[in-house]
Amino acid sequence: MVQFLGKQGTAGELIHMVTLDKTGKKSFGICIVRGEVKDSPNTKTTGIFIKGIVPDSPAHLCGRLKVGDRILSLNGKDVRNSTEQAVIDLIKEADFKIELEIQTFDKSDEQQAKSDPRSNGYMQAKNKFNQEQTTNNNASGGQGMGQGQGQGQGMAGMNRQQSMQKRNTTFTASMRQKHSNYADEDDEDTRDMTGRIRTEAGYEIDRASAGNCKLNKQEKDRDKEQEDEFGYTMAKINKRYNMMKDLRRIEVQRDASKPLGLALAGHKDRQKMACFVAGVDPNGALGSVDIKPGDEIVEVNGNVLKNRCHLNASAVFKNVDGDKLVMITSRRKPNDEGMCVKPIKKFPTASDETKFIFDQFPKARTVQVRKEGFLGIMVIYGKHAEVGSGIFISDLREGSNAELAGVKVGDMLLAVNQDVTLESNYDDATGLLKRAEGVVTMILLTLKSEEAIKAEKAAEEKKKEEAKKEEEKPQEPATAEIKPNKKILIELKVEKKPMGVIVCGGKNNHVTTGCVITHVYPEGQVAADKRLKIFDHICDINGTPIHVGSMTTLKVHQLFHTTYEKAVTLTVFRADPPELEKFNVDLMKKAGKELGLSLSPNEIGCTIADLIQGQYPEIDSKLQRGDIITKFNGDALEGLPFQVCYALFKGANGKVSMEVTRPKPTLRTEAPKA
């Protein structure tokens, strides 16, 4: 609804009232900014201006608002000198209706602004939404009466215009915030949309993807759909591309041996970029899904294609990893002629040039290998007595996908995907393998006899058994290497010197299932030996089992603080991954007071070397000697110099939050017999 007051300002500035009703809509559809308009070289007008209008919104449908209009009052409150945030708050408080007093400029000023290179603030915002400015000649009813009342003023304004030089109304409003803020939109997403991020499933997507779209609380409550691996739900897709019609999510499983059968085209207008479906091959991978010529592809697997060239989109399709393809499309109207070419109806008939290979070589087999940066094979050009010249597998990378798929050294390479390599030279064959992406289909021929293959397998198994026996041979304790998840006996030379470790464990300790090293002092004998690490589980010392369930913490500590004559033997178990627990502890620290902890630095944080008697941590008893503080007030301590850690502890006041790491070993020693 639009009502005109019938007032007209100087130089053709029209002042009118506009009432907007957003019933059934998400927002009023106006974007505001505080700025200024230069009336002349010496005067300027400041205030709140309309920076953008959302298509199909109440502000757009009323037809009487345009980019660059100045808001004088809102619901009767003067906003000429108000801040941008204050006006936003007023609009949010206004419920479903707002009354705006608008000051707009006549068309002559607008035309002059178009030719003025300094008017970028006005024109960029205008072009962003492709607004078509409507004239005031269509006013009816109350509008006509308003024009009659203001006729004298309008004539006076025209006379003044003829006698004065044309006014330069350059709109120089600048945004105060980094992102556009729609005045009545709650929980607006103002994050940086450049670059890429990873989804919860571990897939990399564009920040601007619908999978990264932010939903407010109400939208989250309504969205019952589970996110897929790219973060997609239809609610997020519809919000990200709310200006597009008939949005669809299309999923298809790709077959490496079958082409997609998709032809792409660009926009008819060379000033615009888009990726349209020009044609779909009925025999291709997309022939059975809901996609047809004229559809605009806006995303694929989290890669945004909207406003991108179709040639770039083609490269994106080729580089997409995985067997699953998820596309977001917008179905255009049948008479929409945005696509630059006519729909393609005929595709060349696909011929499988590899079929004859199986007729010529009945024992040939197909192997599919996922290429993750490399295939893991090396090839040579050689000659075989039975099949002649060709490309052969000369080497395999151990543990590669090719080895796991069954590729063997000596196999003859007959084809890569749809390309036959029977008559290829070395350069052609390696070029095919380098260009292949995703899942690579190879046709191979094993030329060795079954007896030779069995003999090779037997030799490999024998080699593995010998290696296993070699591992099982007892090692010399003085030089024994500590291997993960195995009990290893080592001998440590101490020569009456301190071992230099802090351990956790004891029946009156928080760790009751084993004795674990939590700190190694750099000047001790353990550090000099260089084999033991923090979180190593010590099962016995000098043949005496350390069963902490029957030993006090003091007794366990004494075992490691005793001065041994020459050497000490330890049975060590190194768990991989380490057996740990993490928890948070909150303490209160008064200004000028200490925390009551004696700390020693290590590579993952600070180990508690001692608790000062009478201080809060010792009384609270949540912490103990040997605990490792890995975070302090949210700051990770891993890798920080001890001076920095000390400064963090020293400078803290009030409530202090710490993340503590404590060993939690599996019970590996038996209780002593009574």
Curated annotation (Swiss-Prot):
Record-linked InterPro entries: PDZ (IPR001478), PDZ_scaffold (IPR051342), PDZ_sf (IPR036034)
Region of interest: Disordered: 133-192, 458-481
Functional note: Involved in the negative feedback regulation of the light-activated signaling cascade in photoreceptors through a calcium-mediated process. Interacts with tetrapeptide ligand located in C-terminal sequence of 3 key components of the visual cascade, tethering them and forming a macromolecular signaling phototransduction complex.
Listed Polar residues bias regions: 159-175
Biased composition (Basic and acidic residues): 458-475
Places the protein is found: Cell projection, Rhabdomere
Residues passing through the membrane, by range: none
A GO CC term assigned to this protein in UniProt: inaD signaling complex
UniProt-recorded name of the protein: Inactivation-no-after-potential D protein
Record-level Gene Ontology MF annotations: calmodulin binding; myosin binding; myosin III binding; photoreceptor activity; signaling receptor complex adaptor activity
Record CDD domains: PDZ1_INAD-like, PDZ3_INAD-like, PDZ4_INAD-like, PDZ5_INAD-like, PDZ8_MUPP1-PDZ7_PATJ-PDZ2_INAD-like
Pfam families: PDZ
Domain notes: Second PDZ domain is a type I PDZ domain that tethers type I PDZ ligand inaC by interaction with its C-terminus.
Tissue-by-tissue expression: Expressed in photoreceptor cells (R cells) of the compound eyes and ocelli.
GO biological process: cellular response to light stimulus; detection of light stimulus involved in sensory perception; negative regulation of opsin-mediated signaling pathway; phototransduction; protein localization; sensory perception of sound; visual perception
The entry's keywords: Calmodulin-binding, Cell projection, Phosphoprotein, Repeat, Sensory transduction, Vision
Disulfide bonds: none
Biased composition (Gly residues): 141-155
Gene name, Swiss-Prot/TrEMBL: inaD
Organism, as annotated: Drosophila melanogaster
Top-level division of the source organism's lineage: Eukaryota
Post-translation changes: Phosphorylated by inaC.
